[in-house]
Amino acid sequence: AAFACIDHHRGLRCGFPEVIFGAGKSIEELVRIVRLLIDKGNDIMITRTTKEVYETLLEIDSCMVYYEQARIIALKHTQIIEELPKIPCLKAKVLVVSGGTTDIPVAEEAAVTTEMFGIGVERLYDVGVAGIHRLLDRSDKLRAASVIIVVAGMEGALASVVSGLVDVPVIAVPTSSGYGLGEKGV
C-alpha cells in the first residue's frame, strides 16, 4: 500500500508483530493493511478502533476478535511468542490497576495488548487513592506481580502510592478521565 509501509519482519526481530494504530485511518485503509498482513501470515492487532471496523474485517477473516472495552481487534494465528521461550518477560505476571471505572477502557487496552504478546495479566480495577483501603485490601495482588501498569486520571497519585508499596517496576499511564491535574492523558 502506497500510504503504509508494513513491517512484515517485526515478529521475527522483536518477538511480536507490528501493531496498527486504528485512530485516524479509514476503514478502506485498515482493510488494505490487514489484507497485506494476512497475506504474509502475520498476526493482527489494531488499537483504538471501532465495532464498525471489526464487522467489516470479519468479511476478510471470521476469526477476528473484537475487545470492545479495549477498542482492539485481534487475530492470532502464528506461534511466534511460543517459539521464543528465551524472552524473560514471557514468564512475568503483569498487574493492570485502574484508579476509577472511567479509566478501565485504557486499562483494558494495556491488558489485552499484554495478553496478545503471551504475557499473563491480572486486573485490579477501581482502587483509586480516594478509597485507599480498596487498594490496601488487595496488597497480595500487588506483591505477586512482576510489573504493574497503573492507569489513573482523576487524582494522578495512584502510581506513586503503588510504587511505594512494591519493589517491582511500575508503569504510570495518565488518562483524560475525571478532573484534576492529569490534563488530557491517554
Spans of features found by a protein language model:
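Glycine-rich phosphate/diphosphate-binding loop of Rossmann-like nucleotide-binding domains
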Residues: 88-131
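Long amphipathic alpha-helical segments
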Residues: 1-64
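N-terminal loops that bind phosphate or other acidic moieties
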Residues: 33-39, 51-53, 63, 73-74, ...
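Glycine-rich oxoanion-binding loops at beta->alpha junctions
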Residues: 72-76, 82, 120-141, 186
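Short glycine-rich anion-binding loops that position phosphate/pyrophosphate groups of nucleotides
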Residues: 25-26, 101-102, 153-156, 176-178
